[in-house]
Structures are given as C-alpha cells and as structure tokens.
C-alpha cells in the first residue's frame, strides 16, 4: 500500500512540474500578427532551467530557460496565413495570423485617433471592416532608472467600433497595405505625443553625442528622486500661472461670458485676419474674448447640434448664454 501511494505522489509532482506557466511580453496576445517569411522570435520568462515547448502551425519546438529564467526561441519562416493557435507550455494565444507587421512610432501626429477625423471620413470608416487588419497601441509607461523589458498591449481587429481608437495614420496605412499585399496586417503603435526621441534612447546611444555626455556627467541624472523634483517644480509653475491668470483676467471678473453683459463697445474684427489684437502678422499672446450673436430657428429648439468653431490654438472654452459647451486644452486640434 505504501509503495502505491509513493508512486501516485511522484506522478502528481511530475504532472504539476510539466504544467508550469510561462510569462510572455504583452505583445504576445490574442489576435496578434507575426511577420511572414522571416524567422519568428518568441521569448519570455519562466522558472530557471524550465523546459519551454512551443506548438505552432502543426509543429513543436523546444528550448530551455536560463539560470535566471529568461528564454527565447526562433520559429522557422512561415508563409502568410491563419488563424492559428500559438501555444507555449500551458499558455494559449488564439486567433494568430502570419502576415506583415509594422512598427509605427512618433509623437502626437502618430497618436491622432480615427474618432478625431470622423468629420471628414465618417462614411468611409463606418462602411469598412477587415478582420485581417490588427492593431495594438502600447500603453503609457516609463521608467527613469532602467529600460523596461515588457509593455502592456491588447490587439484589436478593424471593426467599426474598435477602429475609432486606432491611430488615423495607422488606420489608413493598414487599409492600403492590406489591399495591396492581401495578407494580414499588424500595426504596433508605440508613440507618445510631445516626447523627444532621446527620452526613449539608451544611454549608450546618447553618449555618442557631446551634449549628452555633459548631461550624464551630472549626478542628478542618476538620482532616482530627480524626475519627481522636476515634475513637482513644473506643477508649481502651472499652479502659479493659473493663479495669476485668474487674478489678472478682467473678463473673468466682469463675467464677459454672460448673456446679459453689454459688449456694444467691443471692436468688431475679422478672425481670419491675423493682425487683430494690436500686433502685426500674429495676434498678441494672452486671453482673448469673442462674442457672436446667432439666431436658432424654433424648429431646431431642443435638438442636438454641433458648433463648429474651427481650429483654436492653443486652448479655448466656448459658452452659449453663459453655459460652457466645450473646451480644448490641446494646441494641435482636431
């Protein structure tokens, strides 16, 4: 009896040890696209020395994790196709295609979403869906001390709902590429508006340039508290600016936004002429108030409406009869 119990116990231990899960980068997830006709790198983390078994497209591949748990393997070249299951030990990734993968990076122009160009392209966007276009946007994350090994990603297919959150440039590029290549198209959007490329470069690459060498000689860049000190100083400056603006803004004090305010002595201007505000060729910096009276026919009373005021740079707030109906705090609309 003791012998039987011993054998069963050993078998249970063996079964558990072979089912240990691996950890994968966020980019490896359902609906992903792998690059065709080139070796496919797969990597991740596991228990030290653990055996890694990869099943893909009817074949199996094996490797072993290092002493510190990292592992990687290159799958052989694949032709375009899918959908497939990519299984790594007990982790299963579904609806995987092989096609062409593009990395899109940049600043705000690369982040501008489809929903913000709907005024011009609504009919085209609402009439198009394509399961062979897959998109993922790397979520915001940063580390001022060391490079990150992982990112948070979710792959989405090109349907009328999810496409609204695609970057517009990526969306139209993917449509064109899919029509031309007739294979699955994967778009990895790794962009962050307003950030400089140096922010995402390694120290080794930046040290090739003299101006960065000088910066790295300063001890502040190796101080983990330095980023927070910069952030706090900037927040204090912004707070002080808003306090001064509130104290000095005559329009705010005298309630110029209210319907009852008498603006009969205000100057009439042409907003399409850049000389208004007392300056040549460009308006004066500061806070400007504009008032315009419009008549709404009774037949439209109570209905939804869109007020189009054009591009207002850098920021604005719009009031109707003293009620704020919209504002922009972003200097590059739409």
Which residues does each PLM region occupy?
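Aromatic-lined ligand-binding clefts that engage carbohydrates, nucleic acids, or primary amines
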Residues: 43, 266, 294-322
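Loop/turn elements at helix/coil->beta-strand transitions in domains of secreted/extracellular proteins
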Residues: 100-101, 130-131, 180-186
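Beta-strand-rich ligand-recognition modules
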Residues: 58-81, 311, 319-334
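Short, aromatic- and glycine-rich surface loops/edge beta-strands on solvent-exposed regions
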Residues: 81-90
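Bacterial Sec-dependent N-terminal signal peptides
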Residues: 1-23
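Extended carbohydrate-recognition surfaces in non-catalytic/accessory domains of CAZymes
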Residues: 150, 154, 158-162, 224-305, ...
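Non-catalytic, glycine-rich low-complexity segments
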Residues: 20-48, 96-104, 111, 270-282
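Edge beta-strands of extracellular beta-sandwich domains
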Residues: 63, 91-100
């Amino acid at each position: 009896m003791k012998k039987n119990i011993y054998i069963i116990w050993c078998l249970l231990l063996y079964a558990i040890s072979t089912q240990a899960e691996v950890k994968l980068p966020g980019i490896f997830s359902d609906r992903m696209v792998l690059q065709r006709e080139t070796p496919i790198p797969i990597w991740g983390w596991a228990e030290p020395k653990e055996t890694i078994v990869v099943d893909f497209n009817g074949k199996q591949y094996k490797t072993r994790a290092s002493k510190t748990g990292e592992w990687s393997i290159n799958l052989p070249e694949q032709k375009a196709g899918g959908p497939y299951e990519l299984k790594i030990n007990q982790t299963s990734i579904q609806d995987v295609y092989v096609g062409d993968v593009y990395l899109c990076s940049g600043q705000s122009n690369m982040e501008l979403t489809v929903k913000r160009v709907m005024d011009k392209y609504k009919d085209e966007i609402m009439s198009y869906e394509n399961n062979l276009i897959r998109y993922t946007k790397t979520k915001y994350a940063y580390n001022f001390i060391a490079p990150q090994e992982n990112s948070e990603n979710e792959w989405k297919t090109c349907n009328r709902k999810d496409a609204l959150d695609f970057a517009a440039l990526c969306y139209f590029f993917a449509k064109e590429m899919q029509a031309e290549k007739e294979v699955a198209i994967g778009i990895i959007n790794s962009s962050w508006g307003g950030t400089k490329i140096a922010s995402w470069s390694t120290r080794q690459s930046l040290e090739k340039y003299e101006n960065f060498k000088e910066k790295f000689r300063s001890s502040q860049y190796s101080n983990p508290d330095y980023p927070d000190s910069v952030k706090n100083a900037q927040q204090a400056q912004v707070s002080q600016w808003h306090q001064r603006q509130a104290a000095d803004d005559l329009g705010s004090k005298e309630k110029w936004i209210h319907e009852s305010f008498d603006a009969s002595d205000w100057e009439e201007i042409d907003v399409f002429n850049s000389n208004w505000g007392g300056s040549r060729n460009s308006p004066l910096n500061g806070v400007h108030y504009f008032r315009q009276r419009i008549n709404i026919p009774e037949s439209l009373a109570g209905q939804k409406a869109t007020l189009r005021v054009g591009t207002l740079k850098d920021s604005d707030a719009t009031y109707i009869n003293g009620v704020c109906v919209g504002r922009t705090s972003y200097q590059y609309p739409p």
